[in-house]
Amino acid sequence: MHIERLDFENSPYLGVYGRATDRVLLLREGLGEKKLEVLREVLKVPIIETSIMKSRIVGIFAAGNSNAIIVPWYIWDAELERIKTALNEFGIDMDVVPFKSRLTALGNLILTNDKAALVSKEFTREEANAIGEILGVDEVERGMIASYRSVGSVGVVTNKGGLVHPEATDEELEWLSDLFGVDIYVGTANMGVPFVGSCMLANSYGVVVGHLTTGPEIVKIEEALGFLG
């Protein structure tokens, strides 16, 4: 199964609490084994349970792709060591890089797959270039989606497709498609929520959406992320 509905302690905002890549899922601590098993089955990657800066909102703080995970500079040493140790135990050769910036909500401010990264205009040009180097992408741009600077919360992109805020223009969709090298659609989740990045955990193998997501929304999400046809 490549798509499932789930809640985290009755919250439908799964993307707030985790960061999925094609190699690993960083996830908040304290979820039951049944939910972890659903995530493993759908996303098909190992799970590393952790906090970041003693907080459960791992998806807001962490961004990443198959090459690297970027975390705030202020991550606790024990948390960073836990993530690195777990990656090593799983046999995953992947960088985890604390990023020195006044900004900490990196997951909300960075949208990336393995080809490219779109970062918020809140970052300087120098910071954007540094993020691109860490993520090992071919291209990095500063920009907005549908007039929102929090590009990571209003979008989801994988190596197979992407979904963004329904107010994104046709010109933005074309630009994003060229940047990321995949088709980009508009849509919502959790009964009309436009901040799709906060509503789901997705990679190239599957997607787990908030439990309030409707049938028509699921069809659009499947299409956008390359799971139809």
Curated annotation (Swiss-Prot):
Gene3D superfamilies: L-arginine/glycine Amidinotransferase, Chain A (3.75.10.10). The keyword Membrane does not apply. One of its GO terms (molecular function) is translation initiation factor activity. One of its GO terms (cellular component) is cytosol. InterPro entries: eIF6. The keyword Protein biosynthesis applies. It holds the Pfam family eIF-6. GO terms for biological process: assembly of large subunit precursor of preribosome; cytosolic ribosome assembly; maturation of 5.8S rRNA; maturation of LSU-rRNA. Binds to the 50S ribosomal subunit and prevents its association with the 30S ribosomal subunit to form the 70S initiation complex. This is Translation initiation factor 6. It comes from Thermococcus kodakarensis (strain ATCC BAA-918 / JCM 12380 / KOD1) (Pyrococcus kodakaraensis (strain KOD1)).
